[in-house]
Amino acid sequence: MSRSTDASVFVQTAYTLRAVWADLWQRKFGTLLTILVIAVSLTIPTVSYLMWKNLHLATTQFYPESELTIYLHKNLSEENANLVVEKIRQQKGVESLNYVSRQESLKEFKSWSGFGEELEILDDNPLPAVVIVKPTSEFNVSEKRDELRTNLNKIKGVQEVRLDNDWMEKLTALSWLIAHVAIFCTVLMTIAVFLVIGNSIRSDVYSSRSSIDVMKLLGATDQFILRPYLYTGMIYALLGGLVAAIFSSFIISYFTSAVKYVTDIFAVQFSLNGLGVGEFVFLLVCCLIMGYVGAWIAATRHIAMMERKE
């Protein structure tokens, strides 16, 4: 009994899908316009999400973590400087550090600055010893980093502590802004998709009014009557999602050359990322849900309105 019921449901579903597809193909121009409107509506939040995704990837790739640069007093002897370094190492929130002595700082400066001969004229080394500190993950948030910076400044022998996170904070703020823009676009375009599907289903319901009346006279259930409209809404949304993914891919490809030009200037390696497989599947699932819900709301409402008028 169960197998025959399953087969009956499968046959009914296949028959309804064929009928819906034949109807959509018969009025293919209107179907194409509806799908394109849905696709454009979905492309906007998809591209906004991809902008946020790529900026977030760039932020984590080029600025994976912030560092604190500590400048020691120049009048410290090498022995006292080592004692200060040990105090810094024992400070809570310090994961690792790299100590560069005054002599090493001068040697590095000579090697890349090209002022080696000029620096030989000076009687005293003008560069301080430097300690580069990597904070622990707990202290890698803004408030904790500031707290660590304050504590390091209190250590005797420390002249200045600089927090190298200006670009990180700017990129994080920009990423936050784009994320909110993406959310706003998603909400607006989701409403637009519901309206487009609802309007299309409304037209289908009123054009099939006589068929609906006949089915009701024959004792058809509401679910049976609604099924073609639900499938129509899901097909609209699914095809719109597929076209939106294609549009998004074209847009990412278009901007890839521009991004490569910029990254070549800055001598870094970065390429734009499109939708992953999981993200693509998630987009299609969301489209199916939107199509189903939008079609159900529109069809139920307008069929009920027709019944009240009768």
UniProtKB/Swiss-Prot annotation:
GO terms for cellular component: cell division site; Gram-negative-bacterium-type cell wall; membrane; plasma membrane. GO terms for biological process: cell division. Residues 53-176, 256-279 are periplasmic. Its main location: membrane. Disulfide bonds: none annotated. Residues 1-31, 198-234, 301-310 are cytoplasmic. InterPro entries: ABC3_permease_C, FtsX, FtsX_ECD, FtsX_proteobact. Part of the ABC transporter FtsEX involved in cellular division. Belongs to the ABC-4 integral membrane protein family. FtsX subfamily. This is Cell division protein FtsX. It comes from Haemophilus influenzae (strain ATCC 51907 / DSM 11121 / KW20 / Rd).
